[in-house]
Amino acid sequence: VAEGTESGGHIGETTTMALVPQVVDAVKIPVIAAGGIADGRGIAAAFMLGAEAVQMGTRFVATQECNVHENYKQFVLKAKDIDTRVTGRTTGHPVRTLRNPMTKEYLEKEAAGASFEELEMLTLGGLRKAVVDGDVKTGSVMSGQIAGMVKDVPTCKELMARLIRETKETVKKNSFLVEE
């Protein structure tokens, strides 16, 4: 899996657009693209970069079958394109989440030079708080930059049908690039 920095959760520094072709060129096994993929346009783009499949986390969090707390799903649905934050850069463990009071406090403490231990105590159990308890204020609501593109909570079956349709439409729309 070649996962770009647009992803939610623990991230690296390289974007999906730059990472996927480099990984495709470096290995002889199928590459799965992840990070920043929310719809058929993103899937088609990943295929054009050489990926043979995609991994979509944030988009599938907002499905009926996903067993995260309803508050978590609703927080993703309300997100805008500028609502993710990356905490933990100074610790060497960067994490992308949706902004909330906890991320604000974390980033303030991180900027002030707080110790690793102090920062760790602030986020201890944070994912469980958000996913299980539905605490989207002090929990860690891990989400990718595509959260602002998520507008509904379909079933996985409905979402898959939509993604396949959108991917085909995107490829067909851009088929003028291929000479016959």
PLM feature spans:
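Conserved active-site-proximal phosphate/metal-binding subdomains
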Residues: 14-32, 38-180
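Conserved beta-strand positions
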Residues: 1-2, 56
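Glycine-rich, proline-tolerant flexible connector loops at the mouths of alpha/beta enzymes
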Residues: 2-10, 61
